[in-house]
UniProtKB/Swiss-Prot annotation:
Assembly with partners or alone: V-ATPase is a heteromultimeric enzyme composed of a peripheral catalytic V1 complex (components A to H) attached to an integral membrane V0 proton pore complex (components: a, c, c', c'' and d).
Domain of life: Eukaryota
Stated name of the protein: V-type proton ATPase subunit G
Species per Swiss-Prot/TrEMBL record: Citrus limon (Lemon)
Function: Catalytic subunit of the peripheral V1 complex of vacuolar ATPase (V-ATPase). V-ATPase is responsible for acidifying a variety of intracellular compartments in eukaryotic cells.
Amino acid sequence: MTSNRGQGGIQQLLAAEQEAQHIVAAARNAKMARLKQAKEEAEREIAEYRAQVEREFQRKLAESVGDSGANVKRLEQETEVKIHHLKAGAEKIQYDVVQMFLKHVTTVKN
């Protein structure tokens, strides 16, 4: 009978060990599932953030390109005005400059 009791005790221990292994395996699987879910959630958040940043970048890029076109037009207008002022100023003093050159070229000095 004692050997029966010993066999029963061993069987109980083996059964308890198997149950413990099942519990550990289930816990490990649950942990892996949680990690996988957390990874997928993090990847989804990263993708959403990346898309948001890309949209913001494209919006700012479009704004700056629009501003660039306006700046080009403004600079062209300012340049035309400055060229006109320079030409007008040159026309005003053109006669005097030509006369001064003629005077210096035709005057003989000893």
